[in-house]
Design a protein with these regions (language model features):
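Conserved N-terminal substructure of TIR/SEFIR domains
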Residues: 2-151, 246
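Structural alpha-beta junctions
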Residues: 87-95, 186-202
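Conserved beta-strand-loop-alpha-helix hinge of the TIR/SEFIR fold
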Residues: 116-137, 143-195
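Short beta-strand segments at enzyme active-site cores
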Residues: 97, 155-158, 205-209
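C-terminal tail/extension regions appended to the core domain(s) of diverse proteins
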Residues: 1-23, 191-246
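Acidic, low-complexity intrinsically disordered regions
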Residues: 55, 97, 180, 237-238
Length: 246
């Protein structure tokens, strides 16, 4: 990782500039999806052995990308359009993290049906499911950390869907804390504070960003204020300036 940005997009810039690149963004995302789907069916053997190392390496073999985008699943169309804009305007290929994390549950479902389901009781074994979940999450989080380490730039797509101020009282007292309820976003932002900065081999600056989705009623809050404070703030006018330099 060479640099990291905290990007807060505006509705105006999205509607007038980025949105028209959604079609290409969809194509990029779909290509990544096919790679992920292929990966899911390849490394679970008939004798019950899961090749975690090969699975992890294949899962992120498509991540030799210029940019990693971290985002909320609620912003997926905006992020796809943003990825299309980066490709069309700068020739940069961005990896959208939810392309992989969105299939985390598919992988777990496949494993659980094969190894955790009791056909007689027609139920899943609770302890085995905890075991498989911990393994899959560990494999994917490790792979993501390696991916982030090998990427020049990370862009956090910061919207109200990803970050919220903790409460009104803290705002009044000037003790703002930026909170996320997504464990994957928390993991990614935390990693940006721990990864060593690497000088790129070429002079151009690239961007990258990863994200995650939270779809359950259980909400766990993570304070990511420190991680965001260490990022470079990025706004629409910076994007326009970069585009004009092309």
């Amino acid at each position: 990782m060479y640099t990291k940005f905290n990007y807060s997009p505006s509705g105006y810039f999205y509607n007038h500039e980025i949105n028209r690149h959604l079609s290409n963004g969809n194509k990029i995302f779909s290509a990544h999806e096919k790679e992920v789907q292929k990966c899911l069916s390849q490394y679970i053997t008939e004798d019950g052995i899961i090749n975690g190392t090969d699975l992890k390496e294949h899962w992120f073999s498509i991540t030799k990308k210029d940019i990693l985008i971290s985002h909320s699943h609620c912003d997926i169309n905006k992020v796809k359009a943003f990825a299309g804009w980066l490709h069309d305007c700068f020739g940069l290929e961005a990896f959208i993290d939810s392309c992989s994390w969105g299939y985390c549950d598919d992988l777990l479902n496949k494993i659980d049906k094969k190894y955790c389901y009791d056909s007689k009781k027609k139920t899943y074994d609770y302890h085995l499911r905890n075991y498989t979940t911990s393994h899959v999450h560990m494999m994917l989080s490790t792979a993501l950390a390696e991916m982030m380490d090998n990427t020049e730039c990370i862009i956090f797509f910061n919207t109200p869907n990803t970050i919220n101020l903790e409460d009104e009282l803290n705002k009044i007292n000037g003790k703002n804390k930026e909170i996320t309820t997504s464990p994957w976003i928390y993991h990614e932002l935390s990693m940006t504070t721990m990864l060593q900065r690497k000088q790129p081999k070429r002079s151009e600056m690239i961007m990258e960003h990863s994200s995650q989705q939270s779809r359950y009623d259980l909400k766990v809050k993570y304070d990511v204020t420190k991680a965001l404070n260490e990022m470079i703030d990025l706004e629409d006018n910076h994007m326009e300036e970069w585009y004009e330099l092309e």
